[in-house]
């Protein structure tokens, strides 16, 4: 396990966040792929390991307690490493899909200290892009942080449907809470957020903790309206 933790720390991504971003990353759930296999945390995709070039890939499932439009968020970075320990490809999640993380001007990887991918988070929404210029072409990127804040209430993914529950009242409370407490105007100035190594964990550990994390925030929201 210690070897795995050292590996996870060695390739941990640097997330560039807006200076006014109201949410922080509180955990990364990690999976090391040494062969082609379907992702458990991003079930719509298979992580393909071309053994001629790739020794392993690390999936970082990035946890936020909130998205600016709904309760809780999970984004992903995939780092592909060759047999010499060099990063040869980086992908990251973008609104349910994924993009290659390369410099838009020269197509090269963007790495800090040679092994840490640098990616940019859409303000409030946290979709990941390789260049902050891309954010301005995303529909409603600004409105989602202001008048559209909280619009989606509590999201309940199928894998947690038996442990996270919502209703019409909670949906309305969550929308109002997010808009009142977290609504903001992005600065479009970005600063690095690097998660402490002790907050790296296996995906299974993070997955097991998610219902408790979400239900704690639901309790905070309910308290907000019943002071």
For each predicted feature, which ranges?
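Short N-terminal edge-element motif at the start of the domain
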Residues: 4-90, 98-99
């Amino acid at each position: 396990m210690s070897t795995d933790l050292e590996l996870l720390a060695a390739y941990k991504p640097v997330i560039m966040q807006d200076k006014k971003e109201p949410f922080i990353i509180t955990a990364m759930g990690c999976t090391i792929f040494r062969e082609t296999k379907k992702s458990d945390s991003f079930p719509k995709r298979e992580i393909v390991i071309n053994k001629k070039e790739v020794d392993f890939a690390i999936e970082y499932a990035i946890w936020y307690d909130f998205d600016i439009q709904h309760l809780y968020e999970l984004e992903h970075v995939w780092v592909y490493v060759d047999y010499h320990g060099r990063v040869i490809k980086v992908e990251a999640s973008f609104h349910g899909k994924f993009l290659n993380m390369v410099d838009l001007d020269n197509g090269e990887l963007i790495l800090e200290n040679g092994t840490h991918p640098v990616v940019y988070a859409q303000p409030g929404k946290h979709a990941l892009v390789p260049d902050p210029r891309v954010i301005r072409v995303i529909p409603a990127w600004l409105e989602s942080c202001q008048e559209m804040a909280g619009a989606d209430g509590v999201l309940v993914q199928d894998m947690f449907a038996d442990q996270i529950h919502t209703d019409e009242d909670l949906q309305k409370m969550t929308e109002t809470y997010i808009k009142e407490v977290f609504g903001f105007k992005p600065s479009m100035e970005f600063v690095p957020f690097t998660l402490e190594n002790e907050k790296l964990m296996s995906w299974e550990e993070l997955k097991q903790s998610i219902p408790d994390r979400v239900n704690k925030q639901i309790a905070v929201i309910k308290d907000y309206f019943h002071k």
